[in-house]
Amino acid sequence: MVDVRKIRLILELRESGIVNPQVLSAIEKIPRENFVPKAFRNQSYENIALPIAEEQTISQPIVVALMTEALEIEKSNKVLEIGTGSGYQTSILSILSRRVYTIERIKSLLVTAENNFKKLKLTNIVTKHGDGNL
């Protein structure tokens, strides 16, 4: 089934200057609605940040796209992400790279993210609970 909202978002990202086809394809493949609470799923393809849990937010899609495009990721790359959140950005990075290492300080968010990765069968993500302190 074609999701008109997702198509509209991809077009909006293109109009905003996102040109990397791999980035746009990764965003199209990852269902953003899986990464937000049920109460906000109807807004999941609007270009806005949304609350997730623990007073945290999922980034606005244009921010995710700009950051991802700026990385110039290649499939052979390994990526370190600080702040997993619900796992949306992590999932996009996993499509574009060989492996993603991600750390999250809030355990409940990490558990949610790990469940999201399992649902999407994303197996190249290594998670860690912690604040990054050595």
Please provide the spans of the model-predicted regions.
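N-terminal auxiliary segments of SAM/dcSAM-dependent transferases
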Residues: 1-39
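Conserved alpha-helix/loop element of class I SAM-dependent methyltransferases that forms part
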Residues: 8-11, 15, 47, 58-77
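Cytosolic histidine kinase catalytic core of two-component systems
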Residues: 21-22, 62, 108
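Short, surface-exposed glycine/acidic/tryptophan-bearing loops
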Residues: 39-52
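Conserved nucleotide-cofactor-binding alpha/beta core module
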Residues: 72-134
